[in-house]
Amino acid sequence: EDTLLVINNHLESFKIGDSDVKAYQEIIDSPNDKKNAVGIRKLVKKLAEGTVIRAQQVDTIASIASRFKGKGVIVCGDFNDSPVSYAHRVFNETLQDAFVQSGNGFGFSYVQHQMYFRIDHILISEGMQSYECTVDDSMKGSDHYPIWCYVSWK
């Protein structure tokens, strides 16, 4: 009998608000302006806090998923983290990135405030294959575009 574990998640965000976006834009526009120091410290603090909480969440999810090694596992959702993050590195020990397997382009799922990130992911067991992994940028109901794909057993 086949087993499939699906873990759909929304990992901790950086809680970047409008004032943070404004500070970020000012830093980009005038990187050497000393008055940006407060904005930089505030952004770094938010990034650090979000990263610590998300790492704990990732460790918990990875522990649960590891109990199903050799079975079908799909971990998907809003990771609020890029493909070069701690989250991705931990999950990639046992799972494969469906977008890398069968997607095209950059796969940006978050496109706001002149920021472009691939932070929504579908990760699958090694015994599975993804097809036509797509970020659907025609869907405008959220600040994220949905990512979807077909998955089959190898």
Label each PLM-derived region with a short phrase:
Residues 27-39, 64, 98, 103:
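Low-complexity, intrinsically disordered or weakly predicted helical/coil tracts enriched
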